[in-house]
């Protein structure tokens, strides 16, 4: 199975109606044309992939090696650079633009993003644990429960308070509702990880139902 992919920014959520009146919640992803910066092959790199750049940035923020790298593709320095494997290398050359029409309505995709960060949180909010007794005289309300008296150590994987969110997560098998090449927009059914204006990666689903 060959993979297609594109980088974009999450704009937010809205809803669309189908011809039969069904309401579908969708996530709007703005994906300006991505540029292929490098085509990697087994002979030169040991694996096959394409390197893609998304969103221009000021040249003053790039060093000479980065400028020289993007100059081979006749483009400007890019803010985000990612790789896509399992692609049909014959369809891409350095400098090729990847637009939203690489996907069509009905395609099934996986969307990867970085979840919202919530800072340091306790077990109840972070892990969904239950509160303790809230009555007068109770010695604990929102603390973690006992870890046991004998083992004299904390088991690996024990759920404890800590930082919540800001993790890379992938939502699988989302359906593309529509694409708009003029506005560089993809509408995907359902929600995707990340805050508004965060960068997301859209790829062909690896577990799509046939």
UniProtKB/Swiss-Prot annotation:
Gene of this entry: rplC
Record InterPro entries: Ribosomal_uL3, Ribosomal_uL3_bac/org-type, Transl_B-barrel_sf
Quaternary assembly: Part of the 50S ribosomal subunit. Forms a cluster with proteins L14 and L19.
Residue ranges that the Swiss-Prot or TrEMBL entry lists as coiled coil: none
Record carries keyword Oxidoreductase: no
GO CC terms, sorted: cytosolic large ribosomal subunit
Protein name: Large ribosomal subunit protein uL3
PANTHER family listed in its UniProt record: 50S RIBOSOMAL PROTEIN L3, LARGE RIBOSOMAL SUBUNIT PROTEIN UL3C
Record function comment: One of the primary rRNA binding proteins, it binds directly near the 3'-end of the 23S rRNA, where it nucleates assembly of the 50S subunit.
